[in-house]
Amino acid sequence: MKQRWLLVLILCFFTTSLVMGIHGKHLINDDFNETALLLAFKQNSVKSDPNNVLGNWKYESGRGSCSWRGVSCSDDGRIVGLDLRNSGLTGTLNLVNLTALPNLQNLYLQGNYFSSGGDSSGSDCYLQVLDLSSNSISDYSMVDYVFSKCSNLVSVNISNNKLVGKLGFAPSSLQSLTTVDLSYNILSDKIPESFISDFPASLKYLDLTHNNLSGDFSDLSFGICGNLTFFSLSQNNLSGDKFPITLPNCKFLETLNISRNNLAGKIPNGEYWGSFQNLKQLSLAHNRLSGEIPPELSLLCKTLVILDLSGNTFSGELPSQFTACVWLQNLNLGNNYLSGDFLNTVVSKITGITYLYVAYNNISGSVPISLTNCSNLRVLDLSSNGFTGNVPSGFCSLQSSPVLEKILIANNYLSGTVPMELGKCKSLKTIDLSFNELTGPIPKEIWMLPNLSDLVMWANNLTGTIPEGVCVKGGNLETLILNNNLLTGSIPESISRCTNMIWISLSSNRLTGKIPSGIGNLSKLAILQLGNNSLSGNVPRQLGNCKSLIWLDLNSNNLTGDLPGELASQAGLVMPGSVSGKQFAFVRNEGGTDCRGAGGLVEFEGIRAERLERLPMVHSCPATRIYSGMTMYTFSANGSMIYFDISYNAVSGFIPPGYGNMGYLQVLNLGHNRITGTIPDSFGGLKAIGVLDLSHNNLQGYLPGSLGSLSFLSDLDVSNNNLTGPIPFGGQLTTFPVSRYANNSGLCGVPLRPCGSAPRRPITSRIHAKKQTVATAVIAGIAFSFMCFVMLVMALYRVRKVQKKEQKREKYIESLPTSGSCSWKLSSVPEPLSINVATFEKPLRKLTFAHLLEATNGFSAETMVGSGGFGEVYKAQLRDGSVVAIKKLIRITGQGDREFMAEMETIGKIKHRNLVPLLGYCKVGEERLLVYEYMKWGSLETVLHEKSSKKGGIYLNWAARKKIAIGAARGLAFLHHSCIPHIIHRDMKSSNVLLDEDFEARVSDFGMARLVSALDTHLSVSTLAGTPGYVPPEYYQSFRCTAKGDVYSYGVILLELLSGKKPIDPGEFGEDNNLVGWAKQLYREKRGAEILDPELVTDKSGDVELFHYLKIASQCLDDRPFKRPTMIQLMAMFKEMKADTEEDESLDEFSLKETPLVEESRDKEP
């Protein structure tokens, strides 16, 4: 018996050993396979690892991959998680290498630089959580792969990428899926009607924010929608005037955000909102909703916490039923047309409200004292209404809100004094009472508020002084904006304790005394405005210690002493973005000496643009221009000030040569002082300078030739000095009017008298000289007569040998003010190019003006092929047989010259197949000529709109029109995104799209173009650009040209191609309408087919494609600039439709590597 048991034990031992050996071998193999897959991911997907995150990802015998950085394993050694968040990895993501891991459940790769690529058709995966957010993934097939293969998926986040294309199918089979986030991508086209309803019932979170998705909102089906708690379609292109009938099925929704779309019509009434049991946040902001706010919306009051209806066209009042919103904390009704007494009768009874925004409405009467009942109120914004009476004094009493942080009542009609009771609001951080009619002093209690960061009360009639002791109890004050008041006294020394100060504006008051040197201790100070006061003493050298200073305005004071060279040594070196988040307006003085200073920067938060007309600097000056919506910034390295105005003082001494090192300086005004010495040659380093005023000083010496290289210079004034010598030829110096050089007795050259000709002396001096030199004059006269006789004989001999045509040409040339030559460019230049230089990089050969004159038959009408706002275009055949187009700029003082220089500095150095090449230039006296490559078919305007005329218009089928649309878009995209700095065209129109012999579109006429970069965004606009019918609506408000303005103009061109109609045609659209208005109305009414040219509909081109292009045109023509696509996104849309089938590396670059331009101002959100 014992032997049997022993045998059994031995068999069990061997069996167990065999099983364990086999199992161990499998474990080893599985571990090896998982390690190999991770190494394959590192090898195939990671091209750059700057932080050496994967440094320990190396195969070592005996050691598994569980110890590798970012890898997590189960207890039995299987890889279940990979976390490489924010590691800085770059490469092309091959997701299959990771999803092949059989036990991988959690994959976190967000915050890297992965692009899409590799195989997206792998086998099944077992991921539960996938986070690829904040990368550069563009291929939507990766989303389809994840939805189709990862059957256990619970959460997927691919937000903040560059996904393009249409939304695919919804993963109805993923029964565990709860979260899908595809926000902040470039997804486009119509949302499939069943896309939302096809998701499994488990879905709780769906975010499609900030794409280009379109379609009628009412067509969407939400199905049963049982568990959905978060749904956002904000910042898309949804339209329609009704809400989906199945949306109330989502009974458990907590957040519904469909803001920033194109929704029209009225908010649903009736019981539509009664089904929502848990809705806490509803945002319908920034659409086109109209009518009155329905009382039935208050059915949400039992749970509603946040309600945002701002940026629509609602009228009337907030219904009384909203008093039941006991949980409501955030109410935003701004930017509508609301009126009435609802603040008193309704809002004041919602005692739990914390944030109240009703700015930009039509509410009048007194500010209701009953608002003090809202004891939890933190932010009160009543800006830009019609409030009258006094500022309420009841806030922060024992019974009212002790937590009030912001009170904003700017741009109203309040009167009386600033209540001292506001000093009881110990939590107050921001007070903005600007643009009212307040009087009296600012109470001392307000100055002592411990948490006050923003004190803004400009444009009132405030009196009194700024008390000593500011910031003694703490340096929290960041912005002190009290300009345009009646303040007296001196600037207190204690202001130097405001160590967080960013912006000080005390200009246009009655301040006296000296500028405190302690201001130099404010290392965060970015803007200092003390102009138009009676300040005296020296400019403190300590201001050079303000390392963030970018804006210094000291004009119109009584300052003396030398200009401190320290201002150029350290300014603008740190604190990038130190004043971001502020809204500004710059009022530029263009009226010469009638108004002092270069202009003024004003805080623009909560101010309607039309109210700026009240400012003395606007209505008192003969010519001013207002730039609004600006965002100021500083530079992280090698920066400088961008604005320095110390004009109308009594400063003396020399100009420090270091001022020429301020490479970001855009405005330098030293005029009307007592400055001596010479203009530093280092001023050639002011590469961003736009306005340079050195007038009315005692400067001597020559104008430095280096000034001729300042490409951005649009206004120069050196008049009333003692300058001598010639005005440097070249650049823009010869294009400024005579008045800019006047009263410098020794200056000569264009536009003044020619150098070498003596200035005319007084009559008495000439008579005296004549009496002394009679004999000499007689002898000189005889000699001169003999010489003239000899020259006449020689001239007659030469004339007999010259043809009549040559005679006429020579006489014409001799009649010109000065002689000149043409420069002809032989070879191309690589693209893209930096265009900050004033000369071409390739050799030039000479052509005489006579050659161009001969080629155009004296610029006769027979050779003229077109004309525009800035000149005429002639066809010219040169002696070598080549045909060119010559643009002769009109001779308008200043404008033609500025046009000429702008052309030379931009298009002359740019080569692209969809741009008209500038071949050469010519400048002869007052003549300004540009020589272009000749385009056989002329302009799109002529070809498209003159089919039936005798001017050679021809029929364009859809294939030709599509080719033209894509070519023009490609050229404009090149200007916006590949030129460094970027270029805004400013005058895109069909007459500026030329067609070569192959009907390839070429964008032409950059006469209105200005370089756009971080240096030139806000101060460089000198004329309102554009042609009627093509000008975007925002240009009439801010006068600021933007890339999105070009996109709008391109949308008009695309609409022309689709409709065959002109942008403005009173016979077609009436006197009060145009093509855009007509098309938008039809599009809203779902009559888009009526927009299309009948010739295209019968052209077998495919209605679907036509409507795709019509939808793109509609997006380009959105009234809101931020809703328009960029040209990169447009090219991506064309590529998605496979419209651009050519191999185009630059297009691929646009599609996959989009970089933001200078950010355009969006509608301000609280």
Swiss-Prot record:
Gene Ontology molecular functions:
ATP binding; protein serine kinase activity; protein serine/threonine kinase activity; steroid binding
- InterPro entries assigned: BRI1_island_dom, Kinase-like_dom_sf, Leu-rich_rpt, Leu-rich_rpt_typical-subtyp, LRR_dom_sf, LRR_N_plant-typ, Plant_RL_S/T_kinase, Prot_kinase_dom
LRR repeat ranges, renumbered to this chain: 78-99, 103-124, 126-147, 152-173, 176-197, 202-224, 227-248, 252-274, 278-300, 303-325, 327-349, 352-375, 376-397, 403-424, 427-449, 451-473, 476-498, 500-522, 524-547, 548-570, 664-686, 688-710, 712-734
Which reactions does this protein catalyse? L-seryl-[protein] + ATP = O-phospho-L-seryl-[protein] + ADP + H(+); L-threonyl-[protein] + ATP = O-phospho-L-threonyl-[protein] + ADP + H(+)
**Where on this chain is Cys pair 1 (motif)?**
66-73
Endpoints of the signal sequence = 1-21
TM regions (residue ranges): 777-797
Q: What is its main location?
A: membrane
Question: What are its GO cellular component terms?
Answer: plasma membrane
Q: Give the EC number.
A: 2.7.11.1
Region (Disordered) residue spans: 1142-1166
- Active site residues of this protein: D987 (proton acceptor)
List UniProt keywords, sorted A-Z: ATP-binding, Cell membrane, Glycoprotein, Kinase, Leucine-rich repeat, Lipid-binding, Membrane, Nucleotide-binding, Phosphoprotein, Receptor, Repeat, Serine/threonine-protein kinase, Signal, Steroid-binding, Transferase, Transmembrane, Transmembrane helix
Cite the domain annotation text: Contains two pairs of conservatively spaced Cys (Cys pair 1 and 2) possibly involved in forming some heterodimers.
Q: Could you tell me what this protein is called?
A: Serine/threonine-protein kinase BRI1-like 1
Tell me what organism the protein belongs to. Arabidopsis thaliana (Mouse-ear cress)
